[in-house]
Swiss-Prot record:
The name this protein goes by in its record: COP9 signalosome complex subunit 6a
Coarse class of the protein's main subcellular location: cytoplasm
Compartmental location: Cytoplasm; Nucleus
Tree of life domain: Eukaryota
Family of the protein in this entry: Belongs to the peptidase M67A family. CSN6 subfamily.
More about this protein: Although strongly related to metalloprotease proteins, it lacks the JAMM motif that probably constitutes the catalytic center. Its function as protease is therefore unsure.
Acyltransferase found in the keyword field: no
Organism for this UniProt entry: Brassica oleracea
Gene from which this protein is expressed: CSN6A
Keywords associated with the record: Cytoplasm, Developmental protein, Nucleus, Phytochrome signaling pathway, Signalosome
Subunit description: Component of the CSN complex, probably composed of CSN1, CSN2, CSN3, CSN4, CSN5 (CSN5A or CSN5B), CSN6 (CSN6A or CSN6B), CSN7 and CSN8.
Function in brief: Component of the COP9 signalosome complex (CSN), a complex involved in various cellular and developmental processes such as photomorphogenesis and auxin and jasmonate responses. The CSN complex is an essential regulator of the ubiquitin (Ubl) conjugation pathway by mediating the deneddylation of the cullin subunits of SCF-type E3 ligase complexes, leading to decrease the Ubl ligase activity of SCF. It is involved in repression of photomorphogenesis in darkness by regulating the activity of COP1-containing Ubl ligase complexes.
GO cellular component terms listed in the entry, alphabetical order: COP9 signalosome; cytoplasm
Biological processes, Gene Ontology terms: red, far-red light phototransduction
Length: 66
């Protein structure tokens, strides 16, 4: 019986703090690297952001607030 296996992975993206834009060339290089490593097509299914606390409000909110 055949099986379908889905493998998920993630990698970092560079954000220019001045313009608040993603470095597209860095993203494209990472995608090409994964294509070579996995020897198959790669698709971006979802994006998410994991960042340091940027403001006092965010810090307080995540700690339970004050």
């Amino acid at each position: 019986k055949g099986r379908t296996v889905e493998i998920f992975n993630s990698f970092e993206l560079l954000l220019d703090p001045t313009t608040q834009t993603l470095d597209r060339s860095f993203l494209e290089k990472k995608q090409e690297l994964y294509k070579k490593m996995l020897n198959s097509r790669i698709r971006v299914l979802h994006q998410y952001l994991a960042a340091k606390f940027n403001t006092a409000y965010e810090r307080n909110t995540r700690r339970g607030g004050r």
